[in-house]
């Protein structure tokens, strides 16, 4: 059976770079407070670009790297919790802006695990013969979903996009395995509310609070548990040793979470890719951004085995094993 391999990649961030010190202008916080609790030093915040704009720019780089035209793409999946609109989907907007007229396109919402979910879908559709060249994108403008008066949450997030091109292959490389899971019973630990139920047939009017509401302690316990389990599970399932893994790319949420998992597993810290100090938590974009940056910097090369592991709202989590 044919598999799916990565042949192109690209990342994009808005131009507006926000250092921790700038947050002190309107928040009771400090650079030291943010760094010591999260590891984050700066993030990019969009001023006039939508999620689709970020996705398009990352996709152009990925297509150029792959040596493909937009018309050669037959599938576009965008993982996002901050779409441009309820409808049309961000993926359809991206399809139009790229001129990918032969692609069918849709969004998925699996929060910070979204890129892993999209990877599984893209791989499955290529393996089934339903697609040949797929554009898989993680893109977010989380800045529009933040309560900028809540220092506990607004300092954590940033905007950005990462994209990869998958194509069918018979080579011994590509996406080897993807495991994803969900637990909706704990979904209230991380919520961005939707529109309130307002109608002329309902007494009173509700006020929308469509910004991120997070139980930090519960998310920490959840994240550390499922990250550890997901890494162990994929190693055991694929019968591969940690020594054979060149890098582990976790969702970039908080350095404390990553450091906790490193200690629990006893895996060398240098195997874990971290760049959240420069981007903050970009949700579904964090894993592809970290992947692209690692390849661009020469830290990953053809033939390397990597594990991607994510967790997020839903609750959702998952991991993928990839041979570049």
Swiss-Prot record:
Subcellular location: Cytoplasm
Gene Ontology terms for molecular function: 3-oxoacyl-[acyl-carrier-protein] synthase activity; beta-ketoacyl-acyl-carrier-protein synthase III activity
Pathway(s) per entry: Lipid metabolism; fatty acid biosynthesis
Reactions performed catalytically: malonyl-[ACP] + acetyl-CoA + H(+) = 3-oxobutanoyl-[ACP] + CO2 + CoA
Keyword Cytoplasm: yes
Active site: 112, 251, 281
EC number, UniProt record: 2.3.1.180
Origin: domain of life: Bacteria
Domain notes: The last Arg residue of the ACP-binding site is essential for the weak association between ACP/AcpP and FabH.
Protein function: Catalyzes the condensation reaction of fatty acid synthesis by the addition to an acyl acceptor of two carbons from malonyl-ACP. Catalyzes the first condensation reaction which initiates fatty acid synthesis and may therefore play a role in governing the total rate of fatty acid production. Possesses both acetoacetyl-ACP synthase and acetyl transacylase activities. Its substrate specificity determines the biosynthesis of branched-chain and/or straight-chain of fatty acids.
Quaternary structure note: Homodimer.
Name this protein carries in UniProt: Beta-ketoacyl-[acyl-carrier-protein] synthase III
Lineage summary: Bacteria, Bacillati, Bacillota, Clostridia, Eubacteriales
Gene: fabH
């Amino acid at each position: 059976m044919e598999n799916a391999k990565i042949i192109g990649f690209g990342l994009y961030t808005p131009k507006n770079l926000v250092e921790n010190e700038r947050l002190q202008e309107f928040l009771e916080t400090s650079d030291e407070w943010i760094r010591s609790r999260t590891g984050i030093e700066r993030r990019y915040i969009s001023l006039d670009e939508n999620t689709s704009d970020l996705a398009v720019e990352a996709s152009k780089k990925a297509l150029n790297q792959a040596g493909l035209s937009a018309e050669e793409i037959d599938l576009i999946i965008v993982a996002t919790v901050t779409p441009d609109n309820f409808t049309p989907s961000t993926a359809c907007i991206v399809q139009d802006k790229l001129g990918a007229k032969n692609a069918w396109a849709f969004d998925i919402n699996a929060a910070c695990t979204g890129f892993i979910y999209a990877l599984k879908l893209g791989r499955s559709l290529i393996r089934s013969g339903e697609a040949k060249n797929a554009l898989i994108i993680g893109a977010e403008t989380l800045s529009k979903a933040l309560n900028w008066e809540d220092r506990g949450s607004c300092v954590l997030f940033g905007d950005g996009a990462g994209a990869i091109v998958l194509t069918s292959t018979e080579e011994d490389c590509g996406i080897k395995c993807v495991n994803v899971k969900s637990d909706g019973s704990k979904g209230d630990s991380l919520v961005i509310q939707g529109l309130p139920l307002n109608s002329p047939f309902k007494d009173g009017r509700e006020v929308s609070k469509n910004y991120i509401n997070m139980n930090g302690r519960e998310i920490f316990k959840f994240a550390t548990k499922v990250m550890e389990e997901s890494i162990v599970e994929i190693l055991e399932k694929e019968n591969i040793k940690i020594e054979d893994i060149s890098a582990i790319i976790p969702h970039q949420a908080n350095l404390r979470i990553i450091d906790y998992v490193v200690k629990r597993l006893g895996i060398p810290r240098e195997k874990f890719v971290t760049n959240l100090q420069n981007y903050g938590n970009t949700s579904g974009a964090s894993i592809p951004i970290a992947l692209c940056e690692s390849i661009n910097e020469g830290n990953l090369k053809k033939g390397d085995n990597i594990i991607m592991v994510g967790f997020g709202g839903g609750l959702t989590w998952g991991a993928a094993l990839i041979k570049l």
